[in-house]
């Protein structure tokens, strides 16, 4: 509920629309427009066209980073360390929301060039490790 309220307040301040990606009936009851079970193309399109993604999902954080979309991450009750790790890797810890009264986090700059470089470097390292592990 706090994250939903934050999304509505942030959208009002920035004059944005809230669009939720829904996977169940309960998602329809929340505020804003809900896109239920979008196709892969629609799903990625929502990320690409978003002014900002507000999420407590590691995967949504990763999509935002890979697609160059502004985002705000919230640590969920579980699995928060994955989000913290990718934010640290990409130097985007400033995009972590720690208080629901912080509306300035959205204005903090993301060095998208650095993010892209760090992700490419990590991919290269991981592919090299995998090739060695498989003796290829």
Locate the predicted segments by residue:
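Active-site anion-handling motifs in enzyme catalytic cores
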Residues: 1-136
């Amino acid at each position: 509920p706090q994250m939903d309220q934050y999304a509505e307040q942030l959208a009002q301040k920035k004059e944005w629309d809230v669009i939720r990606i829904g996977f169940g009936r309960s998602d329809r009851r929340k505020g804003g427009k809900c896109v239920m079970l979008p196709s892969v193309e629609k799903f990625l399109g929502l990320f690409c066209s978003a002014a900002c993604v507000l999420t407590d999902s590691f995967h949504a954080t990763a999509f935002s980073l890979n697609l160059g979309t502004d985002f705000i991450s919230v640590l969920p009750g579980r699995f928060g360390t994955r989000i913290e790790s990718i934010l640290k890797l990409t130097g985007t810890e400033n995009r972590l929301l720690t208080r629901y009264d912080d509306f300035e986090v959205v204005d903090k700059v993301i060095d998208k060039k650095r993010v892209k470089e760090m992700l490419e470097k990590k991919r290269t390292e991981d592919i090299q490790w995998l090739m060695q592990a498989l003796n290829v």
